[in-house]
Amino acid sequence: MRHKRSTRRKRASATQLYQTCKASGTCPPDVIPKVEGTTIADQILRYGSLGVFFGGLGIGTGSGTGGRTGYVPLGSTPPSEAIPLQPIRPPVTVDTVGPLDSSIVSLIEESSFIDAGAPAPSIPTPSGFDITTSADTTPAILNVSSIGESSIQTVSTHLNPSFTEPSVLRPPAPAEASGHLIFSSPTVSTHSYENIPMDTFVISTDSGNVTSSTPIPGSRPVARLGLYSRNTQQVKVVDPAFLTSPHRLVTYDNPAFEGFNPEDTLQFQHSDISPAPDPDFLDIVALHRPALTSRRGTVRYSRVGQKATLRTRSGKQIGAKVHYYQDLSPIQPVQEQVQQQQQFELQSLNTSVSPYSINDGLYDIYADDADTIHDFQSPLHSHTSFATTRTSNVSIPLNTGFDTPLVSLEPGPDIASSVTSMSSPFIPISPLTPFNTIIVDGADFMLHPSYFILRRRRKRFPYFFADVRVAA
């Protein structure tokens, strides 16, 4: 067992020790001078400050701001502020007085009237007017004629083709109530005009349902799913339950709980840490609704899942986005499908391996019980005849391979295919006689004349540089 090391207790501060040990006289020798300020450093500062004055420089135990003027870099002068100049008063003129001048100063008399310069306007007085009246005492006489026959007046009007009466137009009736535009005019005009039909967006013609003339918005374009982006993890699902009940891959099924609708977005809550039935669906909190897409010639069933791998203290969930997909079936062209159907129709429907089975679709073969298929010494291409109960025999060529033992051989035709040999045929080399080693014995030889001429050697000149000195 490892021994625990004892921790060192911190010593009390000098101020705390001074308060407790001053009265009893048990203070350490370095406590009292430090608290009372009688150390050697304090005495040097105390007596040295009597002969040296550092006022205004901020040297000492101050705030370290450099005093009132602050710190100034060496070799530079602090910027001086411009002193604002006060306005100079004009000098007062002093009259010189001689000895013979009078000592009485004449005063200037002030007048109470101020001459404005322009005369005051005068208001004209109304002069009045004369009214002359006259009175006539003669009574008024009215001449009244007797009532005669009534006169008939006729008025005839002629139509002027160069002038037409302007038509009086009234505001049209509101078209929102019934959906029809009605224009009325009390007079008939002969103006030529073009009748332009107006489009109305009112659908209902019922006067009870009040609609507006706002056009109906069209369908929005289909947004991109973004299933194959860089931030989305691609996971292929093989389990068929992913199509019908995807919740079984995330959580374990509870029989007492109502089933999920696979066409909606599924939300999951994980209260405790438990593994998912499928490890690919671990930490899934949401499975969005499915989408059918076609990619690379297949019909793909896709769902986007949201994981909650991390959870912060504030409750925010952080996780990756996963694209789960399952390919349903390949999309093939029409011609390939027709060709496959024709090939499928030619295949045999009888899959029995009994020797008594009959395939009526392609051939009729009846094999005997004779053990002829275990002959391992048969040649490369042999013909085996099977006896049947019919009046004729059918001879079918069989290929047993390169003399290899057969474990089992199902009855049926063996179609021989032409096998091309990969080895090339042997071609003899002419001459057929082998070469013998020829040995020539001799003590002398003749040199070819081309070797008598010696090559001229090129002279090698040493290269020296005038500005370089090499030490030997």
Swiss-Prot record:
Where is the major localization of this protein? virion
Q: Which UniProt keywords apply?
A: Capsid protein, Cytoplasmic inwards viral transport, Disulfide bond, DNA-binding, Host endosome, Host Golgi apparatus, Host nucleus, Host-virus interaction, Late protein, Microtubular inwards viral transport, Phosphoprotein, Viral penetration into host nucleus, Virion, Virus entry into host cell
Q: Report the locations given in the UniProt record.
A: Virion; Host nucleus; Host early endosome; Host Golgi apparatus
Cellular component, GO, one term: host cell nucleus
Q: Where is this motif: Nuclear localization signal?
A: 1-12, 453-461
Query: In this UniProt entry, which cysteines form S-S bonds?
Result: C21-C27
Q: According to its UniProt record, how is this protein modified after translation?
A: Highly phosphorylated.
- GO function terms (MF aspect): DNA binding; structural molecule activity
Name any Gene Ontology BP term.
Answer: viral penetration into host nucleus
Member of which family? Answer: Belongs to the papillomaviridae L2 protein family.
Protein role: Minor protein of the capsid that localizes along the inner surface of the virion, within the central cavities beneath the L1 pentamers. Plays a role in capsid stabilization through interaction with the major capsid protein L1. Once the virion enters the host cell, L2 escorts the genomic DNA into the nucleus by promoting escape from the endosomal compartments and traffic through the host Golgi network.
Question: What name appears for this protein in its UniProt entry?
Answer: Minor capsid protein L2
